[in-house]
């Protein structure tokens, strides 16, 4: 089929898919394919195929308008995924083109996709799957063409509204075809070097671009509200960051490359400049920066669940500390509990959180110190404790980390009569969170607060087994962590507003416990070992809401999914030893085995002093 025949077929034959509401949070950010729409910032040679330029002009030898690669190429390389490219250089939001009459625009692009592609475009199914990233760089030519053809400053808002409405028709159709993940470039052609000396042209283009981008934010906000993941990149902010610190981005000049012969033939020289020789497009190096910004945006949701998980793990560790104060003392150790004791416990814990569809792999670890007191009354004991901990969550490659200063208080109690025992704990904690994310050059940071609750109970019956005691045990442990909303500081093109969120866990367990009581050289040693089968009983699903600070109306919903609820094992062991009159040293080690969301390991070392 000829190129022109393909275009006509696409326009006439593509199905008009009705817009549908997704109505559920986005759940896929694992990109395995890029589908590109737009103009010369994304085009990989489609324009030259359509108009019959083969080979491409010398100034654009690769078919890209940078003389080398564009941001789609960079993104494809960073994500290691293929590209289906429908962008046409010079495309306007309608079906016209700045390069001349009869050359198609955005309408042809999206209709060609829905019609299955072919001709200058790749052959496709006409629908998207949940791991496709759909990119748009459209609207810049509308502003540029409007100014170049005599458009006025007063007429710019109305003209921009028409362009935005036209673009919306195409975006609506593509969302209806299943687009789940959108990346939208928001440019402003007023800042291009080609009109650097023309303030009148700058004013007209700026008015047009500002109104167009605002209208597109409203359109994109509607998709995000229906569950589509929308990443909005403000290229003006990116340009301001580069201009403020060009050397950090690898540039010696933020203007257009000159002289032209050297720029076209020497890519290393051209890439010292932000803009290419045409004063309109970025160099390959400039486009590389844009691709890196988008990749950083795509990474962000995969890190947002860590603060909540950190709060849960910190709460759970304090729960183990409180519970161990009963496990390691009288009357659980078989002795009679009398009077007051004070204790100091140091603890550490670690949890390797496995990668999922909603989060990248990260490690949680922390250390803490707990001080408290117990009071025993024969077959029972009660106690209180205060804790300070320094937990952190760190992603592989340090792409993001959350550090916390945490204060916790809690109470516990238990009794043991003959072989029967029961114990429980309750606690609360305050978290002072420092959240950091890696940027392209400047990183992002936020300080916020959180809190958490913890509670648990355990009961069982131990039978005499020779010189030991053993028997069945059941347990339940609950934790809930809240993280307040926060706004990041740092690179304004990447900073986020993140809404408050909460995470919860309810773990049930059943197993067996073995205890002993030995005297060795006058030292009383009382070890124990516990083996449990545990299972997450709470649904634990949660949805995070966030937006770019540059486009706060586009609020994305990110579903983290249910917590892993498969059976897993937990082995705990420890003991106490009386080292001086009224002074006991105690220790506990605990680890999970076969847990789907990553195993945790913890340890405690403490000393009790009785009065």
Regions found by a protein language model. Name each.
Residues 27-335, 346-355, 371:
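Conserved active-site regions of diverse hydrolases
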Residues 1-28:
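Gram-negative bacterial Sec-dependent N-terminal signal peptides
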Residues 337-611:
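Membrane translocator/pore-forming domains, dominated by Gram-negative outer-membrane beta-barrels
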Residues 21, 49, 54-55, 194, ...:
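Residue-level signature of transmembrane alpha-helix interfaces in integral membrane proteins
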Residues 20-21, 49, 53, 150, ...:
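Amphipathic, positively biased hydrophobic alpha-helical segments used for protein targeting
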């Amino acid at each position: 089929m000829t190129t022109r025949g393909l275009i006509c077929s696409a326009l006439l034959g593509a199905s008009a898919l009705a817009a549908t509401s997704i109505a559920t949070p986005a759940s896929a950010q694992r990109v395995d394919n890029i589908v590109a729409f737009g103009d010369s910032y994304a085009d990989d040679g489609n324009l030259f195929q359509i108009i019959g330029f083969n080979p491409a002009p010398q100034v654009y030898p690769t078919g890209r308008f940078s003389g080398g690669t564009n941001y789609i190429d960079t993104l494809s390389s960073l994500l290691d995924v293929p590209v289906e490219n429908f962008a046409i250089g010079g495309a306007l939001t309608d079906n016209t083109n700045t390069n001349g009459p009869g050359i198609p625009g955005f309408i042809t692009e999206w209709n060609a996709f829905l019609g299955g592609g072919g001709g200058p475009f790749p052959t496709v199914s006409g629908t998207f799957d949940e791991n496709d990233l759909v990119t748009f760089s459209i609207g810049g030519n509308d502003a540029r063409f409007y100014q170049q053809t005599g458009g006025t400053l007063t007429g710019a808002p109305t003209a921009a509204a028409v362009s935005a409405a036209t673009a919306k028709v195409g975006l609506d159709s593509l969302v209806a075809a299943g687009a789940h993940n959108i990346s939208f470039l928001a440019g402003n052609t007023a800042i291009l070097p080609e009109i650097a000396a023309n303030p009148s042209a700058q004013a007209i283009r700026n008015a047009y671009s500002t109104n167009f981008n605002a209208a597109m934010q409203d359109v994109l906000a509607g998709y995000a509200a229906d569950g589509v993941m929308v990443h909005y990149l403000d290229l003006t902010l990116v340009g301001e960051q580069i201009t403020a610190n060009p050397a950090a981005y690898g540039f010696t000049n933020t203007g257009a490359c000159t002289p032209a012969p050297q720029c076209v033939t020497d890519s290393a020289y051209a890439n010292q400049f932000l803009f290419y020789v045409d004063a309109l497009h970025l160099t390959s190096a400039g486009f590389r920066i844009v691709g890196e910004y988008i990749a950083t945006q795509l990474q962000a949701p995969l890190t947002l669940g860590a603060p909540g998980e950190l709060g849960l793990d910190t709460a759970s560790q304090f729960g183990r500390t409180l519970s161990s104060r009963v496990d390691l003392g009288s009357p659980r150790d078989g002795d009679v509990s009398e009077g007051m004791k004070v204790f100091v416990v140091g603890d550490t814990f670690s949890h390797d959180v496995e990668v999922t569809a909603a989060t990248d792999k990260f490690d949680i670890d922390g250390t803490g110190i707990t001080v408290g007191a117990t009071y025993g009354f024969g077959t029972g004991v009660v106690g209180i404790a205060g804790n300070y901990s320094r937990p952190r969550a760190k992603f592989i490659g340090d792409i993001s980390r959350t550090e916390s200063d945490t204060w916790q208080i809690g109470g516990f109690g238990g009794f043991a009569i003959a072989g029967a025992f029961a114990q429980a704990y309750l606690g609360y904690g305050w978290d002072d969170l420092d959240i950091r994310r890696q940027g392209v050059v400047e990183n992002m940071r936020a300080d916020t607060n959180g809190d958490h609750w913890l509670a648990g109970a355990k009961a069982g019956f131990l039978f005499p087994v020779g010189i030991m005691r053993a028997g069945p045990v059941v347990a339940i442990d609950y934790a809930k962590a809240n993280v307040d909303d926060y706004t990041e500081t740092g690179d304004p093109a990447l900073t986020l507003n993140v809404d408050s969120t909460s995470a919860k866990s309810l773990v049930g367990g059943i197993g067996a416990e073995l205890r002993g009581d030995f005297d060795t050289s006058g030292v009383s040693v009382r070890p124990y070992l516990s083996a449990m089968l545990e299972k997450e009983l709470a649904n634990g699903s949660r949805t995070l809401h966030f937006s770019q600070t540059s486009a706060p109306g586009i609020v994305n919903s990110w579903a983290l999914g249910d917590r892993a609820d498969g059976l897993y094992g937990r082995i705990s062991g420890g003991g106490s030893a009386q080292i001086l009159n009224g002074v006991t040293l105690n220790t506990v080690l605990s680890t999970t085995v076969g847990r789907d969301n990553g195993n945790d390991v913890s340890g405690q070392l403490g000393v009790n002093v009785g009065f």
